[in-house]
């Protein structure tokens, strides 16, 4: 065994909107930030298990000119407050403010030219996930991505994550894929993920539930 690989650990990577908090299109008011049911409890379970949690989120509203980059950070601070009040925490936060050139913009909004560019961090590109795994000494094979969109699953696959949990919205129908489990909530994803990790130091090969 490679000695360096033995020091790596599983990491739970989570999308933000529609996964951890209520999905408000281009969220722009702090008062609209609300954790989804069961999220704080599920993150607290991960905390107790010693598994780092990182938020990885696309925030193209910055590039579109809908809200300033500072608001993304204010929103994260509010999420942290809500989690801490419930005895939970996230360990890291990563966001992509970019938007591909030529994308449709809201009428009257010219966007921010320096952010209208191709990048490696806008999901389904894996850049945010790779940064999180690197910063948190994550073992991709034992790590998981949880999100409510196919782009989250594709980013997880590209980053080498062993497991993906795709949250289905009410009435949504989609097909599962190898190593992708369809779930109804973040808390369900965490329950399956934790059940599949080996008990000794979370050193197994990933979560079951396929």
What are these regions (language model features)?
Residues 2-54:
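Active-site neighborhood of HAD-like aspartate-dependent phosphohydrolases
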Residues 2-12, 70-73, 77-91, 100-101, ...:
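Asp-based, Mg2+/Mn2+-dependent phosphohydrolase catalytic module
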Residues 16-18, 97, 168:
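Short, small-residue-rich loop/turn micro-motifs
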Residues 20-22, 63, 152-153:
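Catalytic P-loop NTPase motifs of RecA-like helicase/translocase cores
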Residues 23, 65, 192:
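Residues that scaffold the ATP/ADP-binding catalytic core of kinase and kinase-like folds
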Residues 23-24, 55-60, 147:
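Short beta-strands and strand-loop turn motifs
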Residues 26-34, 67-70, 114-118:
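Short glycine-enriched, charge-decorated loop/helix-capping segments at active-site entrances
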Residues 39, 43-75, 88-103, 156:
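Substrate-recognition element of Asp-dependent hydrolases with the DxDx(T/V) motif
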């Amino acid at each position: 065994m490679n000695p360096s690989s033995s020091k790596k650990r599983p990491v739970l990577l989570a999308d933000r909107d529609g996964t951890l908090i209520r999905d408000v299109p281009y969220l722009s008011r702090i008062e609209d930030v609300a954790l989804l049911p069961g999220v704080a409890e599920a993150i607290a379970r991960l905390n107790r298990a010693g598994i780092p949690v990182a938020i990885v989120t696309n925030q193209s509203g910055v590039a579109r000119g809908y809200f300033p980059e500072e608001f993304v950070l204010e929103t994260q601070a509010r999420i942290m407050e809500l989690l801490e009040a419930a005895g939970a925490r996230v360990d890291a936060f990563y966001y992509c403010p970019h938007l591909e050139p030529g994308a449709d913009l809201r009428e009257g909004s010219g966007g921010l030219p320096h952010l209208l560019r191709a990048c490696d961090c806008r999901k389904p590109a894996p850049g945010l996930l790779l940064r999180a795994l690197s910063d948190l000494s994550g073992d991709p094979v034992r790590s998981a991505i949880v999100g409510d969109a196919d782009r989250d699953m594709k980013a997880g696959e590209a980053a080498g994550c062993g497991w993906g949990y795709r949250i289905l919205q009410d009435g949504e129908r989609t097909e599962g894929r190898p190593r992708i489990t369809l779930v109804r909530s973040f808390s369900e994803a965490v329950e399956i993920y934790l059940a599949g990790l080996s008990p000794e130091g979370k050193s197994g090969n990933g979560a079951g539930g396929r």
